[in-house]
Amino acid sequence: MAIASGSASPVEYDDAIVRLFFIATVTWALVGMLVGVFIALELAWWPANMGIAQLTFGRLRPLHTNAVIFAFCGNICFTGIYYSMQRLLKVRMWNDTLSRLHFWGWQLIIVSAALTLPLGLTQTHEYAELIWPIDWAITLVWVIFAINFFGTIATRRVDHLYVAIWFYMSFVITIAVLHIVNNIQIPATLTRSYQIGRAHV
């Protein structure tokens, strides 16, 4: 746990959450790359799937892209934000419990995607394949992250905000809007839903 110096009283930064997100980043990067190598092998030699539906290119490609987007990129973004934000604002993250809920919730989302995508449970919309319960979980975990994020800004120990913090704010808001608008749907069953605002051919 790093301690800030040069302030009225020392600040113990929550580096444990940074470490967790970093370990998750490396782990999921390896998983995503291994899936990518396997589906590349399938393109060159299709019998690699051994006739198992869950190992076919069509099932594993969404798993690969989602692993790279949500697991690798998502975790590394959170690693950077949790590390730099505390230091730029000279304050510990607003709520340690919310930080842990954010971390474990995000990893549960990734595991859920890794289980459902190979089973063919998708919305069939590229880069928004995840079924509605997982989409709703993403929204919930993002709200937890946003509350902790803006709570930290509200309790900062510096008067000004660095440009990086403004970029982080736009990241939090933009991704929330993008996710919600891109995944508007009416649930039909536990694993099926109807998309709103998309033409079906």
Question: Where do the language-model regions lie?
Answer:
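Extramembrane terminal tails and long inter-domain/linker segments of multi-pass membrane proteins
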Residues: 1-22, 47-54, 195
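Hydrophobic cores of alpha-helical transmembrane segments in multi-pass integral membrane proteins
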Residues: 19-121, 132-153, 165-190, 200
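Transmembrane helix-loop boundary segments of multi-pass membrane transporters
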Residues: 127-131
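Inter-helical turn/loop segments and adjacent helix faces that build the functional surface
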Residues: 152-160
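Residue-level detector of conserved catalytic or cofactor/ligand-binding positions
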Residues: 195-201
